[in-house]
């Protein structure tokens, strides 16, 4: 089953005794919440994440809370979370609420209205807008093929677990046609970062746009000799370094899953064997 994910979330956290205090990290754009009492005490709240987040990531952020992707506008959801009728204490807030009239949305609207003008005025922004629109279309229209293969079930069980700081999942299918690339595409629709490998600076530069993402490498058969094990380990180790255009070192606290889809087994002279968990197609 595809993983539930979203940017805007509503939550309810039941408790007894004193109301729990909440704290948030840099992944959160905005949060509001209050102590309510209907038949029992609970915290009712709304969270805007900076990037799309899975249900699992949200449960790590708010252990014990019931979470749902918000369906209304940001204003409606925050107003509901801070309604007076059932309030006992609060409300409390964190960060700044982003409304639907943000600059990012206006830029996309401008592109949709007249893409030709933007391509002439600012080709770089036009390319980013086109890429975002195409990705949204891909996510909406991508169809999962055979998702009942045994290796895919094993892989899903692994990525449902809390990511370890060390283990790398290596999906090995020597013949081709096992569905590795299709699975990698499906992971894109769930917010994963997709790459076919390459130069470390180039891949890291793309990744640091959102360095909280899980990563799937879809390595072509002809890249076996040039597989960049240093890049794979760098992303897994959560210290991301890129010297493309300007030196950037991005340090991350939270562990991620890293999957390598390949037609070949890992070269254990180039990567520690104990880091690799092989899943056979």
Swiss-Prot record:
Q: What is known of its domains?
A: There are 3 rolling circle replication (RCR) motifs. RCR-2 is probably involved in metal coordination. RCR-3 is required for phosphodiester bond cleavage for initiation of RCR.
The role this protein plays is: Initiates and terminates the replication only of its own subviral DNA molecule. The closed circular ssDNA genome is first converted to a superhelical dsDNA. Rep binds a specific hairpin at the genome origin of replication. Introduces an endonucleolytic nick within the intergenic region of the genome, thereby initiating the rolling circle replication (RCR). Following cleavage, binds covalently to the 5'-phosphate of DNA as a tyrosyl ester. The cleavage gives rise to a free 3'-OH that serves as a primer for the cellular DNA polymerase.
Gene it is expressed from: C1
Taking the record's annotation, the residue ranges forming a coiled coil are none
A GO MF annotation of the entry reads:
ATP binding
Look up the further comments and give them: The genome of nanoviruses is composed of six to eight segments. In addition, some isolates contain subviral DNAs.
This protein's name: Para-Rep C1
Question: Binding residues for ATP, per the UniProt record?
Answer: 173-181
Q: Where is this motif: RCR-1?
A: 10-13
Q: Which cofactor does it need?
A: Mg(2+); Mn(2+)
Native source species: Milk vetch dwarf C1 alphasatellite
**Can you tell me which residues form the catalytic site?**
80 (for dna cleavage activity)
Cofactor annotation remark: Divalent metal cations, possibly Mg(2+) or Mn(2+).
Compartment(s) of residence = Host nucleus
